[in-house]
A protein has these predicted regions:
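Nucleotide/phosphate-binding catalytic cleft detector across ATP-hydrolyzing
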Residues: 1-25, 45, 68, 82-112, ...
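Acidic-glycine-rich active-site phosphate/pyrophosphate-binding loop
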Residues: 29-32, 36, 151-167
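Phosphate/pyrophosphate-binding loops at sites that engage ATP/ADP/AMP, CoA/4′-phosphopantetheine
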Residues: 120-139
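Glycine-rich phosphate-binding loop plus the immediately following alpha-helix
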Residues: 1-3, 43-81
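Glycine-rich phosphate-binding/hydrolytic loop that grips phosphoryl groups
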Residues: 9-14, 166-189
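Gly/Thr-rich phosphate-binding beta-strand-loop-beta motif of the actin/hexokinase/Hsp70
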Residues: 18-47, 61
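A polyampholytic, Gly/Pro-enriched intrinsically disordered region
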Residues: 22-29, 70-74, 182-189
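Glycine-rich phosphate-binding loops at beta-strand->alpha-helix junctions
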Residues: 81-83, 135-159
């Protein structure tokens, strides 16, 4: 039996060998948890995970907007964080029951931004804790569906972290999306 570290497999897939020779940071925001991995060569120099991810955003939307979890999941697919509306702008959500519900655009965006700020704050704490010689130019790659499937999510997340972020994309045609990096990394090993 062989143990495969999911963050290491993910990093080995999305990062070129030359890129791994210098330290890189891979952040994977999944549904229920987030991992922050420092990648150096063919290994991880540090790894930490915490319980907060995209499903927390969905739960926040459900609770704040008074809608079901499934309806909140559908609303999250419509969110565009780069939009700043006025009081008359809404997301129109067709609920699973078939009725149309109007959710104020700015309110829904604020709910999502609040949780993304919490995730980013925790990621920054992880980076500070484990990077004794943290160099501000270490490239950061974002994987997982927790942030990447939210329109404008990566840019807002980068702003919260205070760094440029690139998507960690698997080099596989038709599967080159950050939400597939973890799964394909494990299959690749």
């Amino acid at each position: 039996m062989e143990y495969l570290s999911e963050p290491l497999c993910e990093a080995m897939l999305i990062l070129e060998k030359e890129e791994r020779e210098r330290t890189c940071i891979v952040i994977d925001v999944g549904a229920r948890s987030t991992s922050v991995a420092f990648v150096k060569g063919d290994g991880l120099s540090n790894l930490t995970s915490f319980s907060m991810g995209g499903s927390y955003i969905t739960s926040d939307l459900s609770e704040a907007c008074g809608i079901s979890y499934n309806d909140a999941r559908n609303l999250k697919k419509e969110i565009v964080l780069s939009l700043k509306g006025n009081d008359s702008d809404f997301y129109e959500l067709v609920t699973l029951g078939g009725r149309v519900t109007k959710i104020p655009l700015n309110f829904a965006n604020e709910v999502v931004c609040y949780r993304l700020e919490l995730i980013a704050k925790t990621v920054n704490e992880c980076i500070r804790l484990f990077a004794k010689e943290y160099v501000p130019y270490y490239p950061i790659y974002l994987c997982g569906a927790g942030v990447s499937k939210i329109k404008g999510g990566k840019d807002f997340f980068a702003k919260c972290i205070g760094r440029n972020i690139s998507y960690g994309l698997p080099p596989i045609p038709a599967m080159d999306k950050p939400e597939y990096a973890s799964m394909l990394g494990l299959l690749n090993e």
